[in-house]
């Protein structure tokens, strides 16, 4: 014996296999608890479908409505929700330990913009040559970045050395 394929979405009309349902008519008015046969008749009279809205309730809540229109509205809601989602990107700002004040300000302005857009920022501090002898300068600079953006960003990944570079990740608050 083969089981019928499982449909996604709510059960409609004859697919509803419970003896009694709580019916809501097409105007949104509660009609009360009734046998499934009476609910199906009421839906047929209205020329609409009987759709199971809350299957887990006792008795299940069914509503008389146009199923095609209902599916369309649900799809529209899903699409709207998808549009509103913001994908958080990881932007990278590269610095050097002996960066000039103006250059730092330019980088800080970019970081500010990234945080306003809701993106995370990876601050990478590259050491070259003899700069490796003074990692404390790099740590000092990253702590300055951390302090400057303390109000609008939180540290997600504390500053630490990875090879010839020091990395810190900040996320908007």
UniProtKB/Swiss-Prot annotation:
One GO cellular component, as annotated: membrane
GO biological process: ribosome disassembly
Cell compartment(s), UniProt: Cytoplasm
Keyword annotations of the record: Cytoplasm, Initiation factor, Protein biosynthesis
Gene3D superfamilies reported for this sequence: Translation initiation factor 3 (IF-3), C-terminal domain, Translation initiation factor 3 (IF-3), N-terminal domain
Pfam families for this protein: IF3_C, IF3_N
MF-aspect GO terms: ribosome binding; translation initiation factor activity
Keyword ATP-binding: no
Segments crossing the lipid bilayer: none
Its biological purpose: IF-3 binds to the 30S ribosomal subunit and shifts the equilibrium between 70S ribosomes and their 50S and 30S subunits in favor of the free subunits, thus enhancing the availability of 30S subunits on which protein synthesis initiation begins.
Oligomeric form and interacting partners: Monomer.
Family: Belongs to the IF-3 family.
Protein name: Translation initiation factor IF-3
Originating species: Caulobacter sp. (strain K31)
